[in-house]
Amino acid sequence: MTRREGVQLAALLVAAAALYVTHSFLRYATYEAKGYDLGIFDQVVRQYALFNAPLSSVKGVDFHILGDHFHPILALLAPFYWVWPDPRMLGVVMALALAASAVPVYLFARRRTGHGVALAAVAALLLSWPFQAMVNWDFHEVTLGVPILAWLVWALDGQRAWLATGLAALLLTVREDMGVTLLAVALVMAI
């Protein structure tokens, strides 16, 4: 990738992330954010940031969130709350995760088609309905799986078995049902 191509890709990612963050903050400021789910994730990440068990009073008195869904990857978000302990930080994390998922898509497409088509593929991804729906629905842990899955496909395509294995293990920390997604990826790779 040339410097110019890298700058173009970075500009697209920064623009998308900025739009996602702006949309997320506007939803929060106008009381459009889904208080139930956002409240749960805010409490859980806040507890992790304080080195406490991930309890959520939104789910119930002393409700341990890992009893609802298994998503220990949320503990990795604690440092973000050390910087700014606010539910809107989850909107920033979501925007960064979605934008980061475009990098392996670009690398995958560029190897096959060239810079222009790869950049168009990234733009299409960042503007796609699934991404817009995720941004419009506030933070959910599954959003963290998007870049991991994208990098996993890139690693498999490049026959980077150890990296793919590590990414597959990391994907399992996103949510308990990501094993089904890994099964689908394995079936596609076997064909």
Predicted regions and their residues:
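Start-transfer (signal-anchor) and selected internal transmembrane alpha helices
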Residues: 1-21
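Transmembrane-helix motifs of polytopic, lipid-linked glycan transferases
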Residues: 88-112
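Short helix- or helix-capping micro-motifs
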Residues: 118-129, 168-172
